[in-house]
Amino acid sequence: MARLCTHTESGHYLMALDAGTGSVRAVIFDLQGKQIAVGQAEWQHLAVPDVPGSMEFDLAKNWQLACQCIRQALQKAAIPATAIAAVSACSMREGIVIYDSNGEPIWACANVDARAAHEVSELKELHDNTFEEEVYRCSGQTLALSAIPRLLWLAHHRPDIYHRASTVTMISDWMAFMLSGELAVDPSNAGTTGLLDLVTRNWKRSLLQMAGLRSDILSPVKETGTLLGHISQKAAEQCDLQAGTPVIVGGGDVQLGCLGLGVVRPAQTAVLGGTFWQQVVNLPAPVTDPNMNVRINPHVIPGMVQTESISFFTGLTMRWFRDAFCAEEKLIAERLGIDAYSLLEDMASRVPPGAYGVMPIFSDVMRFKRWYHAAPSFINLSIDPEKCNKATLFRALEENAAIVSACNLQQIAAFSGVQADSLVFAGGGSKGKLWSQILADVTGLTVHVPVVKEATALGCAIAAGVGVGVWSSLAETGEKLVRWDREHKPNPENFAVYQQAREKWQAVYQDQRALVDGGLTTSLWKAPGL
């Protein structure tokens, strides 16, 4: 039997395993929250042949990649495995893993797997077309990416898997299970299944029963930062961690990212600027939006929820623009030894606020109940090359991302009554100083940018540390460890310009959605079941 380690005897480092959409990372931190080393590997989630919308999660291959990252991080840190006081895991949300009665993982899908479009439509018709509203009022989730239609899809198309299913967890819980052999979920990640009650932070089995599905496959629920188990001998041999090292319950990537940013008190607000942009506001008590426009998720802080309004493909749109139109700028930036985005921001800083009226049409404001977007386009272009060029379009994209953020925050405030007085801007987007200032000018809020802009792994490490007594409180530790890089105050003149631009964009976007409705253009993205 493996001997159990405590943090006092095993060393002064914590490990976070971060299973993102595009990659998996093992990150080692010291007890001051400083990142010491990281091992990272990209992974892909491939479609199943003849299963439209599918995004399979390769359990065997991805576990090998996770082990590779753990070994790489230990090697880079030049520390023995005994120096790791505890390990915790976080992941993309919505992705689920199915286990059989022997505890073997037998099926998994990634976060935006959309194979169950027919099942979403079928479920919406239950209870005189009120089932989705019942799910939302209880869990804060709609059916589009929840576990309910995916389980129904398995019942319809893979009964061999469905009837063998004994337990379901999230991907972060799967990583912790592979390390410890113990199965449990945490509220922050499991909340995105649409099966967790926001008030009790526990399963609402009746939702599965209403859908005609089995309700005996739900794992125990444990709070983030509590002990799950210990590294097994088998896992130790696979990934070179020390058998007996504590494994601590982790959580969802966004909520743990907020913990790492110190966004842990009611009314605190963050904009997380990655591939998607998440506008997140902490609410003091569970409440849902009567219009079902935004999602409500359990925070990792017990008793607290977060309302989240999502901008779609914001970071991806910027990357598309850079790669499709800015080959020259990429070469120049490489010669100068700077990032291409920095060069493009420098060019865009010479364009006046409002970008000469150019209106990008990409992500809409979040409309969770009926979630789709207009066709990607630029509206109101000019053929004057002095006014309409790459710098103008790049600035217009940054301004538009901030406008969509402001609209998302406004609809959160409208139903919750929680009005932010400042916000934290993190993620890759916050590296841009111009973008950070534009966000301040558009929202009219002071924007705080942290030193650690990718804070999910830090939040996960905080959970690990709390679990073994390094720290006593998630919230207090998050506030203690966050450090600030810079602050951006809004410019009142620019705010007035952007208010007008925002009103025009909202009107134009509505017309662009009508073109999708009429079958004349193709949506940027449409939720399953629409």
Curated annotation (Swiss-Prot):
Its main location: cytoplasm. Keywords: Cytoplasm, Kinase, Transferase. Pfam families: FGGY_C (PF02782), FGGY_N (PF00370). It catalyses: (S)-4,5-dihydroxypentane-2,3-dione + ATP = (2S)-2-hydroxy-3,4-dioxopentyl phosphate + ADP + H(+). CDD domains: ASKHA_NBD_FGGY_AI-2K. The keyword Transport does not apply. One of its GO terms (cellular component) is cytoplasm. SUPFAM superfamilies: Actin-like ATPase domain. GO terms for molecular function: autoinducer-2 kinase activity. Its EC number is 2.7.1.189. The keyword Kinase applies. It is found in: Cytoplasm. Catalyzes the phosphorylation of autoinducer-2 (AI-2) to phospho-AI-2, which subsequently inactivates the transcriptional regulator LsrR and leads to the transcription of the lsr operon. Phosphorylates the ring-open form of (S)-4,5-dihydroxypentane-2,3-dione (DPD), which is the precursor to all AI-2 signaling molecules, at the C5 position. Belongs to the FGGY kinase family. This is Autoinducer-2 kinase. It comes from Salmonella paratyphi B (strain ATCC BAA-1250 / SPB7). The lineage of its organism: Bacteria, Pseudomonadati, Pseudomonadota, Gammaproteobacteria, Enterobacterales.
